[in-house]
């Protein structure tokens, strides 16, 4: 299949989670997608949890916390609520966050 869209970055920023840092539930209000590139973290670093707009059929949960490692990228629709639990360890978790839209390419 051929991908006939351009990726247009809207915003890019870095986040460093020091001990005690966290993010409250939020979404990214523009249309499009948001992504996280995990740069530096430990297995017990704080996790990003997504709040699903539907119940998981297996366990009826609306929370999804992917197990990620450095180098992983998560991309979700910008309307999806998400948060990060507090950093309880003495290690700085580093991520690169970005928002983007897809622009169709016309031939």
Q: Model regions: which residues?
A:
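Short, well-structured hydrophobic secondary-structure segments
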Residues: 1-2
